[in-house]
């Protein structure tokens, strides 16, 4: 169950990171409300997952999911640049996430 909570927390991190862009520095009300709500839920779920998972693993995977998802949505929704270095970097993050999962009992 902790892994499921962690994945949801990571996806919510992607949501609030993209929400930061749409809130335009918290100057737009509804995108700001959604961003703050996603932040709170993401951190709460991370904390819940960290009750049973090692904090180093939980935090690293949370950040990794957030990073990979934010890069992907930045490309897909915001027209951010796609280049070989970005794709290789994201692939390395994914390898790190998988390695941490495999190295963590639970």
Residue ranges with predicted function:
Residues 1-106:
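Polytopic alpha-helical membrane proteins, predominantly small-molecule transporters/carriers
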């Amino acid at each position: 169950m902790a892994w499921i909570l962690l994945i949801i927390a990571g996806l919510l991190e992607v949501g609030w990171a993209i929400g930061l862009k749409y809130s335009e520095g918290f100057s737009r009300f509804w995108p700001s409300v959604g961003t703050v709500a996603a932040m709170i839920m993401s951190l709460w779920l991370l904390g819940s997952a960290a009750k049973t998972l090692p904090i180093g693993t939980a935090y690293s995977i949370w950040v990794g999911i957030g990073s990979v998802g934010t890069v992907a949505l930045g490309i897909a929704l915001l027209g951010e640049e796609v280049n070989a270095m970005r794709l290789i970097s994201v692939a390395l993050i994914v390898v790190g996430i998988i390695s941490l999962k495999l190295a963590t009992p639970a």
